[in-house]
Amino acid sequence: MGALMIQGTGSNVGKSLLVAGLCRAARRRGIDVAPFKPQNMSNNAAVTPDGGEIGRAQALQARAAGLAPSVHMNPVLLKPETDRAAQVVVQGRAATRAAAADYGALKARLMGAVLDSFARLRTTHELVLVEGAGSPAEVNLRARDIANMGFARAADVPVVLAGDIDRGGVIAQIVGTQAVIDPADAAMIRGFVINRFRGDPSLFDAGRRFIVERTGWPDLGLVPWFPDAVRLPAEDAVDLRRASGGGGLHIACPMLSRIANFDDLDPLAAEPAVRLSMVPPGHALPGDADLVILPGTKSTRGDLAFLREQGWDIDLAAHLRRGGRVLGICGGYQMLGRMIHDPEGHDGSPGSTPGLGLLDIETRMAPEKRLTRIAGRALGQPVEGYEIHMGRSEGPDCARPFAHIPEPDGATSPDGRVAGTYLHGLFSGDGFRAAWLGQFGAASALDYGAGVDEVLDRLAGHLEAHLDIDRLFALAR
């Protein structure tokens, strides 16, 4: 059957969900399908069975396709560490750090890894559905591009262009894309899709005809807004504010500047008994929160300074005085200790940074990243998840571990109101989540994993109702 690529008119136009839904639709047709994204930029990484890293969106797409995630589904992952530099993960392994100004020169060497991973998927699966990054209209990035048209032309993969009508200006998005890209790039596009329409679709019939007349590209369909998308794991930080609920247990989470693996919160956001508040910079932690979760971060020391700049350290102290509780996950756990030592400068400049002092532990950063899937027990319940961090934490409070995986993990304060763990994904386990929420008097009867698959099935049905799926798949080569 071949391969087909979904590119977008911009970031966050719904490419990831379109590919996930198409993967599930292909699977329902009995097609052996695999997702692929040449280059992703995200601190929300998933750990593959062989201990590699890929973007969380590709892990969800793999689930939609009925596959275990593979490092070849996202061969280049950029994990921002500062506004101008990122860690570069190649085929699942951290390869180097690169400043934004230097990354262009590196991309020529990365194309080989991208094409190698793509070839592996293409030879082992009937159909490969490829997701682009950002937009091909970013012509300043076209030279040495590996994420959009540079890849599509190198691998000879036809493209469908997706525009987002919800943000407005979708006619200009699509027509403008054709106007600014190279004619040879435009020739790779086999049609367009309008995503996230609200209201009566017939009201946009004239707009769709105009796009066809101006571009010559076939109209492959208009996809109405899919409200259940909020129940699927988010990858982009831009999606964080969506998390909410109306339950009685109020959980607050500060939006750190380098927040990572925040999909840890998705099972909690799905709980009817939970109200989850994502607290943006410049806002105080809510005084009525029962629990504050300090999430993972790509830069523990940098985000600890950011946390203090927001005054959230003062808010945390007040929260504890009111009888609240605090849980730190990964980098958030490291922040809770007395000191973070980084003599070799693996997380910023060499030196030591005082922590929040809420746990009697100290953390020492190390060059080796612990990257592994684990299973163990916590609160008498089985837990599964993964670790993805640098550094090791030790101290008296580690004598009261948060979990056993099977070795002791994490720490708990003597009064039990402050705890930390290195374990990501622990809330996805229904038994543990129910036991953990039960400590707060909140009940849970949610089957989170089944809920994700139900939404993926509904997403596939939604696309099947509004797109000519068979025509789309016939474009693959």
Curated annotation (Swiss-Prot):
Biological-process GO terms, alphabetical: cobalamin biosynthetic process
SUPFAM superfamilies according to UniProt: Class I glutamine amidotransferase-like (SSF52317), P-loop containing nucleoside triphosphate hydrolases (SSF52540)
Entry's Gene Ontology molecular function annotations: ABC-type vitamin B12 transporter activity; catalytic activity
UniProt organism field: Paracoccus denitrificans (strain Pd 1222)
Catalytic residues as annotated in Swiss-Prot or TrEMBL: 330 (nucleophile), 424
Keyword annotations: Cobalamin biosynthesis, Glutamine amidotransferase
InterPro entries assigned to the protein according to its UniProt record, in alphabetical order: Class_I_gatase-like, CobQ/CobB/MinD/ParA_Nub-bd_dom, CobQ_GATase1, CobQ_synth, GATase_3, P-loop_NTPase
Entry-linked HAMAP family: CobQ
Keyword match Transmembrane: no
Domain GATase cobBQ-type intervals: 248-432
Pathway(s) served: Cofactor biosynthesis; adenosylcobalamin biosynthesis
Tree of life domain: Bacteria
Name recorded for this polypeptide: Cobyric acid synthase
